[in-house]
Amino acid sequence: MAGLWRSYQALMAKHPWKVQIITAGSLVGVGDVISQQLIERRGLANHNARRTAKMMSIGFFFVGPVVGGWYKVLDKLVTGGTKSAALKKMLVDQVGFAPCFLGAFLGITGTLNGLTVEENVAKLQRDYTDALISNYYLWPPVQIANFYFIPLHHRLAVVQIVAVVWNSYLSWKANKM
């Protein structure tokens, strides 16, 4: 396991952006597999591989670039590594970024699932508030620790590891019709 971590760190040092995006996409896919197998109890025979591929695409092309880029912007908006700075970063993240990101994520997923604009709006009206409240139960303490203890280039990976559980929930919520 230590060798795997060293390899990951070496790749992060050499190709940080690519590794962050690949990590995000892969872990969004893992979250969907967990959602289908453990939450929805589909079984392997009924696993929707196309849905997992769609969720991975959202991870590769939306989650990874947007969240990875956001952490760079946030580090410039709120500087320093103090507890106070970590708290400020968490507040800006959870008040400014999380609501927008979550709405976009649910909307993109609905679009990729073939929902019309009207169906997508109705789904957002039905699911957004519940998903945002769930977000606030999980992410504030995770983000304070992330912003205080974790270097910028590892933040997306740390968040995505925690997010395997969150991605499972989001995949279930986003794909529930």
Curated annotation (Swiss-Prot):
Cellular component per GO, a single term: mitochondrion
Tissue localization of expression: Widely expressed.
Role noted for this protein: Involved in mitochondrial homeostasis, and control of oxidative phosphorylation and mitochondrial DNA (mtDNA) maintenance. Non-selective channel that modulates the membrane potential under normal conditions and oxidative stress.
Name by which UniProt lists this protein: Mitochondrial inner membrane protein Mpv17
Gene, per the UniProt record: mpv17
GO biological process, one term: UDP biosynthetic process
Similarity section: Belongs to the peroxisomal membrane protein PXMP2/4 family.
Transmembrane domains' residue ranges: 19-39, 55-75, 95-115, 132-152
Source organism of this protein record: Danio rerio
Coarse class of the protein's main subcellular location: mitochondrion
Compartments reported by the entry: Mitochondrion inner membrane
UniProt-listed InterPro entries: Mpv17_PMP22
Keyword tags: Membrane, Mitochondrion, Mitochondrion inner membrane, Transmembrane, Transmembrane helix
Residues of the site described as Determines ion selectivity: 93
Gene Ontology molecular-function annotations: channel activity
Disease tied to this protein: Genetic defects resulting in MPV17 loss are responsible for the transparent (tra) mutant phenotype. 'tra' fishes display pigmentation abnormalities and lack of cells derived from the neural crest, such as iridophores and, at later stages of development, melanophores. MPV17-null larvae show disruption of mitochondrial ultrastructure in liver cells with mitochondrial ballooning and disappearance of cristae, and impaired oxidative phosphorylation, insufficient pyrimidine synthesis, and mtDNA depletion.
Membrane topology recorded in Swiss-Prot or TrEMBL: Multi-pass membrane protein
